[in-house]
Swiss-Prot record:
Record gene name: alnC
Topology of this chain in the membrane: Multi-pass membrane protein
Gene Ontology molecular functions: metal ion binding; oxidoreductase activity
Classification of source organism: Eukaryota, Fungi, Dikarya, Ascomycota, Pezizomycotina
Protein family per UniProt: Belongs to the flavoprotein pyridine nucleotide cytochrome reductase family.
Cofactor binding notes: Binds 1 FAD per subunit. Binds 1 FMN per subunit.
UniProt GO cellular component terms: membrane
Pathway terms, separated by semicolons: Polyketide biosynthesis
InterPro entries for this protein: CBR-like, Cbr1-like_FAD-bd_dom, Cyt_B5-like_heme/steroid-bd, Cyt_B5-like_heme/steroid_sf, FAD-bd_FR_type, FNR_nucleotide-bd, OxRdtase_FAD/NAD-bd, Riboflavin_synthase-like_b-brl
Factors inducing expression: Expression is controlled by the asperlin biosynthesis cluster-specific transcription factor alnR.
Binding site for FAD: Y302, L303, L304, N305
Organism from which the protein derives: Emericella nidulans (strain FGSC A4 / ATCC 38163 / CBS 112.46 / NRRL 194 / M139)
Protein name: NADH-cytochrome b5 reductase-like protein alnC
Binding of NADP(+), residues: G389, Q390, W395, K396, G397, L398, R399
Broad EC category: oxidoreductase
C-alpha cells in the first residue's frame, strides 16, 4: 500500500473554494468538497476552515467513530512535518511499553535529578541513627545504671526523692533519643522507597490530554447508518412560511445540540436536509422540527404537502454539543430558524444566558411564546433582545441588522468564563464573524465562539 502524499500547508491553502475544499485534521489532509452537503453540522463549518487546520475545533466538537471512518475515505495525504502548527504533534500520542531491563541505561534529566535526591536522602537514616546512639552512650556514661530496668526503678524512686531529678531528666532524654532515631530511620526509608517509585512512574511519557466537551446527560444515537422511519402526525404554521412538524417513532434519543437528517426521493433523486429538533432532549417518541418552506425548496415543499400519517425517512441523530463547564454566561446570536439549536441550549443551560435574535418582522419570530416563557421563569438569569429588520412604526426595540455595537452593549465581554453561540443564515454568520474579529482585535481576551 502506497504511503500518503506529503503536502505543505501552503498547498492546502490553495484549496479553499466551496468546490475545491481541503482541510487539515490531526496532521492529515482531507478533501471535503463533496461531503459539504452531507456534513451533520452543515457546510458552513467546513467552509469556515477551507484551506486551514481544523484540528482543535474538530477535537473540541467531539465526533463518533463513524466520523473517523468517513475521514479515511476523504484522505488526500499527510501534512509535511515542518509545516505542522506548533500545537500539533507530529504523531498521535500513544502509550509506550518500557522493558524493566532497559530502565536506567540512558537516564533523562528528571531521572538524574531524582537519583541524586534519593542517594542524598538515603544517607540520612544512617547519620541520624549514629547520632542517636552516640547521644545514648554519652547519657549512660554520665549516669551508669546497671540496666534499663534498673534505670526505671531509679526513676520511680526519683519521684519521691528531690535529689533524684537528674535521673528522671536523663531517662526522659534517653527515651526521646531512642524514639527519634527509630522514627527518623523508618520515615526516611519509606521516603526513599516512594521517591524510587515516583522516578519509575516518570519514566513513562506524558500523554497530552485534549479538551473534550461534556457529553449530554442522555446521549443520542449517532451515525450515518442509524436509519429510521417516523410517522408524520402533526403540522402547524407558526410563522409566515414556517411550520412546526411533529414526527412520531419508537426509542429515538436526542442529545443536546444534535440534529437529524430528513430524506426523501423527489423526481428520482435522493434529497436530504438537516434539522435540529426543538422538542426536549432525551428519549421521546415525538420529535418536533422547525421547517421553513422556500418557493423552490424541494424538501420543505415535500414535507408541507405530505399527507399526515405518512412515513418519513430520517438518519441520525448527528453531532453533539455541550457548553464548557468553565462557562458562567452564554451569549447567543440567532437569526430565523437558527433559533432551534440555541433554544435547546437555553432550555438546558443552568447559568446566565443572553440572546440577540434577528428577524424581519415581529410575526417572523419563531418560538416567541416559548422564549417568553423562559424569561418569565428566570427573569434574572435569561435575557432576550429582539432585532427586527422591517418592524412596524410603533416598534420600540432594536432595528436593522445585528451590529457590533449591539454585541458590545448587550452581550457580556469575551472572557474564559463566557461562551458565544451563533446560528443563522450564512450571510448573518459571516457578518457576526467579522464583528467578533474586530472585537478581538481591540480586546484583552478573544471570544469563545461556536457556530452551529
Amino acid at each position: 500500500m502506497a504511503s500518503p502524499a506529503s503536502i505543505t500547508l501552503a498547498e492546502v491553502a490553495r484549496h479553499s473554494s466551496p468546490n475545491d475544499l481541503w482541510i487539515v485534521i490531526e496532521g492529515n489532509v482531507y478533501d471535503v468538497a463533496e461531503y459539504r452537503e452531507d456534513h451533520p453540522g452543515g457546510d458552513e463549518i467546513l467552509r469556515q476552515f477551507a484551506g486551514k487546520d481544523a484540528t482543535t475545533e474538530f477535537q473540541d466538537a467531539g465526533h463518533s467513530n463513524d466520523a473517523y471512518v468517513k475521514l479515511k475515505t476523504l484522505l488526500v495525504g499527510s501534512l509535511q512535518s515542518k509545516t505542522l502548527p506548533e500545537n500539533q504533534p507530529e504523531e498521535s500520542s500513544r502509550i509506550v511499553s518500557i522493558a524493566v531491563s532497559d530502565r536506567g541505561k540512558i537516564p533523562t534529566k528528571r531521572q538524574a535529578r531524582n537519583g541524586n535526591d534519593t542517594s542524598k536522602y538515603g544517607q540520612l537514616p544512617s547519620l541520624v541513627l549514629a547520632g542517636g546512639l552516640a547521644l545514648l552512650f554519652f547519657t549512660l556514661k554520665q549516669h551508669p545504671w546497671q540496666s534499663i530496668q534498673g534505670y526505671l526503678s531509679q526513676a520511680q524512686v526519683s519521684r519521691v526523692q528531690s535529689s533524684g531529678w537528674v535521673g528522671f531528666l536523663g531517662g526522659f532524654l534517653t527515651a526521646t533519643t531512642l524514639n527519634t532515631a527509630a522514627a527518623t530511620f523508618v520515615g526516611l526509608t519509606a521516603k526513599k522507597t516512594l521517591l524510587l517509585r515516583h522516578r519509575e512512574l516518570e519514566e513513562y511519557p506524558r500523554v497530552k490530554q485534549h479538551y473534550l466537551p461534556l457529553p449530554p446527560k442522555k446521549p443520542g444515537i449517532s451515525g450515518e447508518n442509524t436509519q429510521q422511519f417516523l410517522t408524520l402526525v402533526d403540522r402547524q404554521c407558526i410563522a409566515p412560511n414556517v411550520y412546526k412538524v411533529r414526527l412520531q417513532g419508537d426509542g429515538l434519543v436526542i442529545g443536546l445540540g444534535q440534529h437529524l437528517k430528513v430524506l426523501a426521493e423527489i423526481d428520482g433523486r435522493k434529497i436530504q436536509r438537516s434539522y435540529t429538533p426543538v422538542s426536549p432532549v432525551g428519549n421521546s417518541p415525538k420529535v418536533d422540527l422547525i421547517i421553513k418552506v422556500y418557493p423552490k425548496g424541494q424538501l420543505g415543499n415535500y414535507l408541507l404537502n405530505l399527507p399526515l400519517q405518512s412515513r418519513v425517512e430520517i438518519r441520525g441523530p448527528f453531532g453533539r454539543y455541550s457548553p464548557s463547564p468553565t462557562w458562567k454566561h452564554i451569549a447567543c446570536i440567532a437569526g430565523g430558524t437558527g433559533i432551534a439549536p440555541i433554544y435547546q441550549v437555553m432550555r438546558a443551560w443552568p447559568g446566565e444566558i443572553t440572546l440577540l435574535y434577528g428577524n424581519e418582522t415581529w410575526e417572523d419570530i419563531l418560538l416567541r411564546e416559548e422564549l417568553e416563557q423562559l424569561v418569565l421563569q428566570s427573569p434574572r438569569r435569561i435575557k432576550v433582545h429582539h432585532v427586527l429588520g422591517q418592524p412596524k412604526s410603533d416598534w420600540k426595540g432594536l432595528r436593522g441588522w445585528i451590529t457590533r455595537e449591539m454585541i458590545q452593549d448587550l452581550l457580556p465581554e469575551p472572557s474564559s468564563s463566557t461562551g458565544f453561540l451563533v446560528c443563522g443564515p450564512d450571510g448573518m454568520v459571516r457578518a457576526i464573524r467579522g464583528h467578533f474579529e474586530a472585537i478581538d482585535a481591540n480586546g484583552e481576551e478573544k471570544a469563545n465562539v461556536f457556530v452551529f
